[in-house]
Swiss-Prot record:
Record-given protein name: Protein Pcal_0062
Coiled-coil blocks: none
Protein family per UniProt: Belongs to the CinA family.
SS bonds (residue pairs): none
PANTHER family the record matches: NICOTINAMIDE-NUCLEOTIDE AMIDOHYDROLASE PNCC, NMN AMIDOHYDROLASE-LIKE PROTEIN YFAY
SUPFAM superfamilies in alphabetical order: Molybdenum cofactor biosynthesis proteins (SSF53218)
CDD domains documented for this protein: cinA
NCBIfam families: molyb_syn (TIGR00177), PRK01215.1 (NF002291)
Gene3D superfamilies on file: MoaB/Mog-like domain
HAMAP family in UniProt: CinA_A (MF_00226_A)
Domain of life: Archaea
Length: 262
């Protein structure tokens, strides 16, 4: 299964001012597309940290997606830091410049040095149109790897991903289908369910099972258990998940007669 890294850039994420919804949204999308998300990294608006994050991600993952830092303000430096990570001099991409110019002209704003910066990217990069904002995304391919830089504004990031990135990843990725089931278990502590989950995964190696406590471990145990799998066909993915779910319920009921499962 091809691997993916997600890099989210912004001081606001690290001080708790903004919740990192972009990472969760992208991780879900990538998982359903058949990519194994191996890291989600949050870095500040600091060049050396962004450079380091890109270099590590490109060394280890097949797909790297970043969000944030593509705008006109002084701390928007992700595109420039990415160039440095590649060892490339940033250039003004004429196609991207046209996109930015037209966006601002339609609102009656002139081009400025700060706005031109939004069109800067490494040579050979492809700008991705932003249908709801001003900063283009950036697509760069090297050595069989795909790197995508997206804006940090969620609706802009989502629009570019769904319009341009998702179709590309579908065409390049494996024929993968994702299936998931969620079951709730009341009355059994998570620690007691853990060996059952381990046994279910041993018997069903294509399936991942994860428990999420929603109540109090001792006084009022309540668990949500997620079961999911990826496979080349929907039938295989659903069959694997259904088999694991059946075994999970069977083992819990056989060991804990007081368990409520729904």
């Amino acid at each position: 299964m091809p691997t993916a890294y997600i890099i989210t850039v912004g001081n606001e994420l690290l001080i708790g001012r903004v919740v990192n919804t972009n990472a969760a949204w992208l991780a879900s999308k990538l998982t359903y597309l058949g990519y194994s998300v191996r890291r989600i990294v949050v870095v500040p608006d600091v060049e050396e940290d962004i450079v380091e994050a890109f270099r590590e991600a490109m060394a280890k993952a097949d797909v790297v997606i970043s969000t944030g830092g593509l705008g006109p303000t002084p701390d928007d430096i992700t595109n420039l830091a990415f160039c440095k990570a590649l060892g490339a001099e940033p250039v003004v991409n004429e196609e991207a410049l046209k996109m930015v110019r037209e966006k601002y002209a339609s609102r009656g704003y002139p081009m400025t040095e700060e706005r031109v910066k939004m069109a800067m990217m490494p040579p050979g990069a492809v700008p991705l149109p932003n249908p709801v904002g001003t900063a283009p995304g950036i697509l760069y391919e090297t050595g069989g790897k795909i790197v995508v830089l997206l804006p940090g504004v969620p609706r802009e990031m989502e629009a570019i991903f769904e319009g341009y990135v998702e179709p590309l990843l579908k065409s390049r990725g494996p024929p993968a289908h994702f299936s998931e089931r969620v079951v709730t278990v009341r009355g059994v502590p998570e620690a007691d369910v853990a060996p059952i989950i381990r046994e279910v995964m041993r018997q069903n190696p294509r399936v991942y099972v994860k428990s999420h406590p929603k109540g109090l471990e001792v006084d009022a145990p309540l668990l949500q258990i997620h079961i999911y799998a990826s496979a080349p066909t929907p039938q295989e993915a659903e069959g694997a998940v259904d088999a694991a779910l059946k075994k999970l319920v069977e083992l819990i009921k056989s060991k804990f007669s007081n368990a409520a499962i729904y």
